[in-house]
Amino acid sequence: MSQSGSALRRNGFTFKQFFVAHDRCAMKVGTDGILLGAWAPVADVKRILDIGTGSGLLALMLAQRTDDNVPIDAVELDAGAAMQAQENVAHSPWPHRITVHTDDIQRWAPRQTVRFDLIISNPPYYEPGVECATPQREQARYTATLDHQTLLAIAADCITEDGFFCVVLPEQIGNAFTQQALNMGWHLRLRTDVAENEARLPHRVLLAFSPQAGECFSDRLVIRGSDQHYSESYTALTQAFYLFM
């Protein structure tokens, strides 16, 4: 079943347990976010931080995957996107667990008195260059407002000693991000290289870093099989969310 088959309403994306409206968000629901939300390790997680929540997709996916006593803080700089995320949360099964903060993570993070077991982000990754159609889309796509070194430093200040910081990035940018993280004292613990099919090279990488050293587990995920249907591994990862799986 194709991903587009789940988009039953034109202004958003329908999942099995919730709906994500995204017509007022610069970055729409896409495969990158769905992969990250389904992949991030959640065992024994007690508190979650979503940096740059956008429509609230990752916060909602993680709410579905975790116990009902796990609070989730979702921070979004763009006021329009944050309002839409708040509406998506309010209409979901977990309005009591997810708090959307309309704020700059660089201002919000230093004020926090608790640390997070899981920090997740689908971060911007383009260097400033060609102008986007709107300032909101430029903010979502380019690193000018939140470069990767700053993001890594903020996550380091907010994470528990044995927590995980998870991101999804294009393959080459992910390699550079990994080296930057290692230089800053992070340890790479999980890596999944994502390819569209067996014949193609990976185009995305899912990364999980921790302040704590340990073995790094690496694997490869192929989205589609030779018949162009979703692969067994992709189906197993995402079937709790996609409506027609």
From Swiss-Prot:
The keyword Methyltransferase applies. PROSITE patterns: N6_MTASE (PS00092). Its EC number is 2.1.1.223. InterPro entries: DNA_methylase_N6_adenine_CS, SAM-dependent_MTases_sf, Small_mtfrase_dom, tRNA_Adenine-N(6)_MTase, tRNA_adenine-N6_MeTrfase. One of its GO terms (molecular function) is nucleic acid binding. The keyword Protein biosynthesis does not apply. It catalyses: adenosine(37) in tRNA1(Val) + S-adenosyl-L-methionine = N(6)-methyladenosine(37) in tRNA1(Val) + S-adenosyl-L-homocysteine + H(+). Coiled coil: none annotated. It holds the Pfam family MTS. It is found in: Cytoplasm. GO terms for biological process: methylation; tRNA processing. Keywords: Cytoplasm, Methyltransferase, S-adenosyl-L-methionine, Transferase, tRNA processing. GO terms for cellular component: cytoplasm. Belongs to the methyltransferase superfamily. tRNA (adenine-N(6)-)-methyltransferase family. Specifically methylates the adenine in position 37 of tRNA(1)(Val) (anticodon cmo5UAC). PANTHER family: TRNA1(VAL) (ADENINE(37)-N6)-METHYLTRANSFERASE. This is tRNA1(Val) (adenine(37)-N6)-methyltransferase. It comes from Salmonella paratyphi B (strain ATCC BAA-1250 / SPB7). The lineage of its organism: Bacteria, Pseudomonadati, Pseudomonadota, Gammaproteobacteria, Enterobacterales.
